[in-house]
């Protein structure tokens, strides 16, 4: 028996924990690159369970599960606390993940290049935000590795997704919180693909889970009273459409100056819905 994160209704922002026997296979890790997962402090719990084969990139800055079939992450997990936010600024150095590329080259594959989104009108959408790693230049640069990106519409990336990112940092900087965050794609509808080979799969939605702790707390202190946020945001155009084949709308300039900064709240959902749509199971005992 082990604790599994589960909730049937977290619109209130609270996660609940129940005991559950594992019913699906453990993560199918093809390759671990980097730190042992037990030493990665960005992971609040054990690796999420998934039926997808994954390559784990375990770094000081985050832990990333990469899917070589979609050529995108299955999820990325990171910790956000006050020491992660500094004055290094945004490097803007989108680049090939050379660690991932070296491994993929062994089977005649390659990692996504910084230019592979060119001409698609999709943003290179950070999962770990640049602004969550501004303590040093090198830490910020790791957020610009293309393995950390998903094809996101400009409206999703620069408006509703960004507003939740800003809210998260406000929790840390203004309320003294520590966050454990997991974000990734949902592929419940065929949305096409981009890239020179048309093999970078476009997600229909993006999910994010945020566990909100006090600065002096550790993952071991997470219980039924621990507040959290779960959202599922559609890969949506500014006009509200999810028809991403509409290149005219997809390529339109987007601004968030007049947008409601709390617009992300309309996308709150339940942990169980995130699990259902993403195919991931979140287990609270750490490896």
Predicted region positions:
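Domain-level detector for secreted/extracellular nuclease and nuclease-toxin modules, and
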Residues: 5-9, 13-287
């Amino acid at each position: 028996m082990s604790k599994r994160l589960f909730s049937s209704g977290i619109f209130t922002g609270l996660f609940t924990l129940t005991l559950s026997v594992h019913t699906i296979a453990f993560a199918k890790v093809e390759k671990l690159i980097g730190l042992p997962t037990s030493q990665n402090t960005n992971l609040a719990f054990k690796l999420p369970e998934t039926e997808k084969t994954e390559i784990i990139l375990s770094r000081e800055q985050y832990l990333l599960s990469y899917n070589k079939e979609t050529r995108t992450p299955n999820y990325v997990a990171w910790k956000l606390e006050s020491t992660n936010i500094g004055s290094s600024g945004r490097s803007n150095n989108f680049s090939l993940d050379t660690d991932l590329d070296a491994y993929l080259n062994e089977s005649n594959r390659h990692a996504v290049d910084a230019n592979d989104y060119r001409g698609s009108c999709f943003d290179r959408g950070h999962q770990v935000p640049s602004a969550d790693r501004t303590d040093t230049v090198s830490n910020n640069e790791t957020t610009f590795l293309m393995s950390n990106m998903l094809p996101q519409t400009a409206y999703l990336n620069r408006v509703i997704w960004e507003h939740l990112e800003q809210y998260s940092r406000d929790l840390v900087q203004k309320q003294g919180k520590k966050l454990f965050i997991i974000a990734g794609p949902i592929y419940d509808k065929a949305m096409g693909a981009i890239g020179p080979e048309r093999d970078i799969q476009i997600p229909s939605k993006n999910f994010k889970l945020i566990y909100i702790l006090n600065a002096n707390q550790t993952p071991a202190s997470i219980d039924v009273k621990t507040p959290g946020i779960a959202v599922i945001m559609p890969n949506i155009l500014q006009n509200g459409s999810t028809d991403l084949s509409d290149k005219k709308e997809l390529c339109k300039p987007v601004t968030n100056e007049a947008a409601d900064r709390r617009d992300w709240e309309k996308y709150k959902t339940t942990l169980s819905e995130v699990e259902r749509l993403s195919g991931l199971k979140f287990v609270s005992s750490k490896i």
